[in-house]
Design a protein with these regions (language model features):
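DNA major-groove recognition helix of helix-turn-helix/homeodomain DNA-binding modules
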Residues: 67-82
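The alpha-helix within a helix-turn-helix
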Residues: 33, 44, 73
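N-terminal flexible/basic segments that precede or flank functional cores
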Residues: 1-31, 35-36, 41, 90-102
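Helix-turn-helix DNA-binding elements, focusing on the entry/boundary residues of the two helices
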Residues: 29, 40, 51, 66-69
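Phosphate-coordinating loops and pocket residues in cytosolic domains that bind phosphorylated ligands
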Residues: 45, 85-86
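Short alpha-helical DNA-recognition segment
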Residues: 37-59
Length: 102
């Protein structure tokens, strides 16, 4: 019996968690931006970040630095914690749906 097959690949789990968290944060940025009627181009100008970088953040493909989170939040006229709380709500809502539909 191969005991290695019974172990969880923790690096793979962590990568998956990071991807899901990045997607939730990106969705929070996007929904806030859209709610305010701001384009990615305007957000890029106001945050002094590249539009392609912001697109990557919103799609969950990029993990923003702490400095970038503060720039994005400032440009959206919200606190960084507001973006994280919205992302957290999304994550918990998704987990609750998964628990209800096994």
């Amino acid at each position: 019996m191969d005991f290695r097959s019974s172990f969880v690949d923790h690096s793979r789990v962590k990568r998956n968690e990071a991807r899901i968290a990045a997607q939730a944060f990106g969705a929070a940025v996007r929904s806030t931006r859209v709610r305010l009627g701001i384009t990615q181009e305007t957000l890029a100008e106001q945050s002094q970040l590249a539009r392609t970088y912001l697109s990557g953040v919103e799609s969950g493909l990029r993990n923003p630095t702490v400095a970038s989170v503060f720039r994005i939040a400032s440009a959206l006229h919200v606190r960084p914690s507001d973006l994280f709380l919205e992302a957290e709500r999304t994550l918990y809502a998704d987990n609750a749906e998964d628990d209800e539909n096994p």
